[in-house]
Amino acid sequence: MKMILTLLLSIASFYAVLVLVNLPAPFVGLEFESGETPRLWFAPPGYVIPIVWFVLFTLLGIGRYQLLQTGQAPYQLWLYGLAVLCAAYAYYTLGLAKLTHISALWFGLTGNIAVIAFALFVAWKLFPVSRPAAWLTLPVVAWTVFASCIVLGEMKLEKLI
C-alpha cells in the first residue's frame, strides 16, 4: 500500500508543478487559443495537447518514483527542472511574443530546442542511476520533436521561414 501511495504522490507532484506554474498565466494576459482547427494535416486537434502533457507528466512522476525506489532521491530534481521548463511554455512563447512583438512561433521553436536538449541531458544524467527513470524521460523528447515539426510547419505557412 505504501508503494502505491508513493507512486500516486510522485505523479500528483508533477501535476502540481503543471498547475502551479500555469496558474498565473491568465492573470498576466497569456491565453492559448482554443477550438482553432489545425492548419497542418499532421497537427492534432487542440484538445489532444493537454492529454499528451498529462501522460508525459505522469511518466515523469513514475520516473521520480523509480528514483525513490532505488535510493536516488537527489536525482529527482532533474525531473522537476524538466517539468518546470515544459510547464513554462506559455511564458516563453506567448509571454515573450507579447513583450517583443516577435512571433510566438520563434520562441516556441527555440523553447522546444531547449526542452529537447535538457530532456536528453536529464536522461543522460539519470541513466547510470535508474535506467527506467531515464527511459521515462525520453517521451518528452519524442513529443517535443513532433511539436517542433508542427511549429516549423506553422512558420512556413506564416512565411517566417
Task: Report each predicted region and the residues it spans.
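Alpha-helical interaction segments
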Residues: 4-5, 42-44, 133
